[in-house]
Amino acid sequence: MDHMSPRLRAFLSEPIGEKDVAWVDGISHELAINLVTKGFNKAYVLLGQFLLMHKREAEFQKWLICCCGATEFEARECSNCLKEWCSCFL
């Protein structure tokens, strides 16, 4: 990846552990509230959804947009963050 935001770099620097979902790159405050309301309060829970979708970025992005109210930018950044985390830790 050519350019990593500081937030993405920080997220990729260590295992997910008990990080709140708001730590995931691309997750705005408003989107975090929507996700928590739907039961996705931790980054590992959101990662689980990504893995259930077999790491298919387009499918995951569509789900974030349609079901959670993400913008296209947020969905793209979030799926990229989780994909990069999987590359580093799985």
From Swiss-Prot:
Keyword Nucleus: yes
Function in brief: May play a role in BANF1 regulation and influence tissue-specific roles of BANF1.
Matching PANTHER family: BARRIER TO AUTOINTEGRATION FACTOR 2, BARRIER-TO-AUTOINTEGRATION FACTOR-LIKE PROTEIN
Organism from which the protein derives: Bos taurus
Alphabetical keyword list: Cytoplasm, Nucleus
Any Pfam family the entry gives: SAM_BAF
Family affiliation: Belongs to the BAF family.
Subunit annotation: Homodimer. Heterodimerizes with BANF1.
Molecular-function GO terms, alphabetical: DNA binding
Transmembrane as UniProt keyword: no
Taxonomic superkingdom: Eukaryota
Name listed for the protein in its UniProt record: Barrier-to-autointegration factor-like protein
InterPro entries linked: BAF, BAF_prot, BAF_sf
Coiled coil segments of this chain: none
Any one GO CC term of the record: nucleus
SUPFAM superfamilies xrefs: Barrier-to-autointegration factor, BAF
Gene: BANF2
Compartmental location: Nucleus; Cytoplasm
BP terms from Gene Ontology: chromosome organization
Main location: nucleus
